[in-house]
């Protein structure tokens, strides 16, 4: 299975900064050992599209609505992402769930809509620290996958990104043993649902100094990287493991 190295820039980088970043990154991208995907903020999607023309580097949106257009103030259109040449949409990130109240039913609608446009949804799942310490990790991930993929087409691509919420932007990293155990659980859940070919990415304070050890764990098919993807050299090192 091919590796995928995805960068979630969240609400960072202006269009100007986006162009400057790709001017640097394209010189380093040849070292990547898998597919590279960037999720810039909505305001920088067009800059990413222009910068990445003629390259094999993919890009997508951090969120979308489950309709192409309409009276949905503040939402993003996956159709526009497609028109710009994008390939992916990030769906169900823990910040969308926690800050904006997105539930599994809405996530499922978005996954199905994105697939219907011929784009690839990258479905984010993960447990909180309280859920892990209460031994509820498996149940939480099983529920998120069951409900989030409820309307998904098994014949079309989908990528799953496991991000323990307690390790996002905190500097805390799941141990290789925790990653191995949880990714094996996620694979088994996906297999039972008929999505055994879906790549499973790990996210949660991934950095150049821990990426090589994490990528060796079973069913880790790449990374979804936050802060460490904002610097070209740092992310290129991660994408080359």
Curated annotation (Swiss-Prot):
Chain residues that bind substrate: 8-10, 169, 205, 226-227
Catalysed reactions listed for this entry: D-glyceraldehyde 3-phosphate = dihydroxyacetone phosphate
UniProt superkingdom: Bacteria
Protein's UniProt name: Triosephosphate isomerase
An example Gene Ontology molecular-function term: triose-phosphate isomerase activity
Keywords: Cytoplasm, Gluconeogenesis, Glycolysis, Isomerase
Residues forming the catalytic site: 93, 163
Subcellular location: Cytoplasm
Function according to Swiss-Prot or TrEMBL: Involved in the gluconeogenesis. Catalyzes stereospecifically the conversion of dihydroxyacetone phosphate (DHAP) to D-glyceraldehyde-3-phosphate (G3P).
Oligomer status and interactors: Homodimer.
Pathway(s): Carbohydrate biosynthesis; gluconeogenesis; Carbohydrate degradation; glycolysis; D-glyceraldehyde 3-phosphate from glycerone phosphate: step 1/1
Enzyme Commission number: 5.3.1.1
One term under GO cellular component: cytosol
GO biological process: gluconeogenesis; glyceraldehyde-3-phosphate biosynthetic process; glycerol catabolic process; glycolytic process
UniProt record similarity statement: Belongs to the triosephosphate isomerase family.
């Amino acid at each position: 299975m091919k590796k995928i190295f995805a960068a979630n820039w969240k609400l960072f980088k202006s269009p100007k900064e986006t162009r400057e970043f790709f001017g640097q990154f394209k010189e380093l991208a040849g070292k990547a050992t898998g597919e590279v995907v960037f999720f810039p903020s909505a305001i920088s999607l067009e800059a990413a599209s222009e910068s990445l023309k003629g390259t094999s580097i993919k890009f997508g949106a951090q969120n979308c609505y489950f309709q192409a257009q309409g009276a949905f103030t503040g939402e993003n259109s996956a159709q526009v992402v497609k028109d710009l040449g994008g390939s992916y949409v990030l769906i169900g990130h823990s910040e969308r769930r926690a800050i904006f109240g997105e539930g599994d039913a809405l996530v499922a609608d978005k996954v199905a809509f994105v697939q219907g446009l011929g784009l690839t949804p990258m479905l984010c799942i993960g447990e909180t620290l309280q859920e892990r310490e209460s031994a509820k990790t498996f149940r939480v991930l099983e529920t998120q996958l069951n409900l989030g993929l409820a309307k998904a087409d098994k014949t079309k691509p989908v990528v799953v990104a496991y991000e323990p919420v307690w390790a996002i932007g905190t500097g805390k990293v799941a141990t290789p043993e925790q990653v191995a155990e949880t990714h094996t659980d996620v694979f088994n859940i996906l297999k039972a649902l008929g999505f055994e070919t879906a790549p499973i990415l790990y996210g949660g304070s991934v950095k150049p100094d821990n990426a090589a050890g994490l990528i060796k764990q079973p069913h880790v098919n790449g990374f979804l990287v936050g802060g460490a993807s904002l610097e070209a050299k740092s992310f290129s090192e991660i994408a080359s493991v």
